[in-house]
């Protein structure tokens, strides 16, 4: 299984995305439990190739849970397809699941690779933190390189969401 996973990673590094998708799908058939996190890489590959149908099917196959590494690529996929309302919806869902989404988008929009790497966990990542977002970023730089303005757009959107929440008056009882 590990040899197949290494092959899968090598295909991605070589830019052979269609072959990588085929290998990733094969890996998921071999290991339904997905102890290696292939589903997350596969989701990023589907976003890269703008394969909405397979991306949504993969999300549903694993319970449709609100997970950082599922929601982030879906937001990028809809951004790439010029479906900004859906992209915003997934960004909002991502921000609810991962409290550091806005911070991550700010650092990525500034292309602050040093600060991003400083946020990386030494022994993996804690779910729901910037560490998880950085891990997703470092494992799928091809997707972020293909959408250089996504992070700026996402940060601006999340910033306006935060500002509008602050402006709303609290209901008095």
Regions found by a protein language model. Name each.
Residues 17, 51-52, 84:
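TPR-repeat structural position
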Residues 25-32, 58-68, 92-101:
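Solenoid-like repeat scaffolds
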Residues 1-14, 33, 39, 93, ...:
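Short coil/linker segments at helix-helix boundaries
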Residues 76-173:
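Long, ordered, amphipathic alpha-helical scaffolds
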């Amino acid at each position: 299984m590990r040899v197949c996973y290494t092959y899968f990673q090598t295909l991605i590094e070589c830019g052979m995305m269609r072959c990588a998708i085929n290998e990733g799908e094969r890996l998921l058939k071999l290991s339904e439990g997905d102890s290696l996190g292939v589903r997350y890489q596969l989701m990023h590959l589907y976003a890269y190739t703008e394969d909405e149908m397979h991306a949504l099917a993969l999300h549903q196959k694993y319970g449709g849970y609100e997970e950082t590494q599922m929601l982030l690529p879906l937001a990028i996929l809809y951004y790439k397809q010029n479906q900004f309302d859906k992209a915003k919806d997934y960004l909002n869902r991502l921000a609810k699941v991962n409290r550091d989404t806005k911070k991550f988008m700010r650092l990525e929009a500034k292309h602050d690779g040093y600060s991003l790497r400083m946020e990386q966990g030494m022994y993996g990542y804690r779910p729901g933190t910037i560490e998880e977002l950085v891990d997703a970023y470092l494992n799928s730089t091809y997707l972020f390189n293909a959408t250089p303005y996504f992070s700026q757009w996402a940060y601006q959107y999340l910033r306006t969401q935060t500002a509008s929440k602050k402006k709303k008056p609290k209901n008095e009882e």
